Amino acid sequence: MTNIRKTHPLLKIVNNAFIDLPAPSNISSWWNFGSLLGICLVLQILTGLFLAMHYTADTTTAFSSVTHICRDVNYGWIIRYMHANGASMFFICLFMHVGRGLYYGSYAYMETWNIGVILLFATMATAFMGYVLPWGQMSFWGATVITNLLSAIPYIGTNLVEWIWGGFSVDKATLTRFFAFHFIFPFIIAALAMVHLLFLHETGSNNPTGISSDADKIPFHPYYTIKDILGALLLILVLMTLVLFSPDLLGDPDNYPPANPLNTPPHIKPEWYFLFAYAILRSIPNKLGGVLALVLSILILVLMPLLHTSKQRSMMFRPISQCLFWILVADLLTLTWIGGQPVEHPYIIIGQLASIMYFLLILVLMPMASTIENNLLKW
């Protein structure tokens, strides 16, 4: 009799995705981040569910309810900090995952890549709305500043902002709807992740060489299941070290005072994982221009397959492109640092130069380097 995992309507889906899936024999640890993102998502949904049991989405009690979770609920503090730092781990894995895709040319699988970009946008939207929920100073002012950016849209901007706010300022209606959206979005992300996986399994995984691995495949289980478990253990180790030893390391102290509409914090800044985009936004003196640059800084990923001019898929054998890739990483780290600094000399000019460099690298320098490398192959 055939094994039940190969015949059962539900089990065979799991079997074909996680057990008997033919995988390249040479994929490195950079291919671990997909499964780690899945673990992060499950962890966020579970901790979020337990937080939602004790949280109240009302301007008068939201802050107190979070305090109540940390002080009075059994292990509430650990659930709250696992959720907050889980978001940071989520974004670390996301950035690594996207970086891997850029380096090894995984964007050639266009459907998988484009759904990945949509997933990135959805995750950023979810994290932003989640940051508003504790209703601290930075929650309130962050929500005010970021939603206000939509007013830069010509003609409909102001109406759009007031429609999102549910009034003439960020208030009870805004908090309630953000909670509703923050609750539903992770499930939309989970559904999109399934589609992401569906498209990936149509083509199979890429590998570090960028060459077809059809001639040399191994079963996903046990080889990559055990590898993913090791990755998961390391992820949990890092997360729990953060949670148990320095839970507020990545947070902003300005979010500890409760929201006060009459008092603006001296430096409004988002969580660390948005700082690079925030720096690009701030480096353009024009409001609409800044908003466009902000959106394009992520949306530019969609253009990656079109900007690929190399005859080789991966950067593994392309030293000039490798060099530019790591300059891009350094540039993004610079932008992240600038995003957390006040708007004054010399930070303004550094931010503007780093922003120009970001778009220049992706749109001009990297395609040029690929063309040069193609010509070098002829020698």
Curated annotation (Swiss-Prot):
The residues that the entry says bind heme b b566 are H97, H196
Q: Give the highest taxon in the source lineage.
A: Eukaryota
Provide the assembly information.
The cytochrome bc1 complex contains 11 subunits: 3 respiratory subunits (MT-CYB, CYC1 and UQCRFS1), 2 core proteins (UQCRC1 and UQCRC2) and 6 low-molecular weight proteins (UQCRH/QCR6, UQCRB/QCR7, UQCRQ/QCR8, UQCR10/QCR9, UQCR11/QCR10 and a cleavage product of UQCRFS1). This cytochrome bc1 complex then forms a dimer.
Q: What is the role of this chain?
A: Component of the ubiquinol-cytochrome c reductase complex (complex III or cytochrome b-c1 complex) that is part of the mitochondrial respiratory chain. The b-c1 complex mediates electron transfer from ubiquinol to cytochrome c. Contributes to the generation of a proton gradient across the mitochondrial membrane that is then used for ATP synthesis.
**Family label:** Belongs to the cytochrome b family.
**UniProt organism field:** Cephalophorus ogilbyi (Ogilby's duiker)
Its localization reads: Mitochondrion inner membrane
Check the record and name the Gene3D superfamilies matching this protein.
Cytochrome Bc1 Complex, Chain C (1.20.810.10)
* Record-linked InterPro entries: Cyt_b/b6_C (IPR005798), Cyt_b/b6_C_sf (IPR036150), Cyt_b/b6_N (IPR005797), Cytb/b6-like_sf (IPR027387), Cytochrome_b (IPR030689), Cytochrome_b_C_euk/bac (IPR048260), Cytochrome_b_N_euk/bac (IPR048259), Di-haem_cyt_TM (IPR016174)
Name it.
Cytochrome b
Task: Give residues annotated as binding heme b b562.
Answer: H83, H182
Cofactors, names only:
heme b
Q: Where are the transmembrane segments?
A: 33-53, 77-98, 113-133, 178-198, 226-246, 288-308, 320-340, 347-367
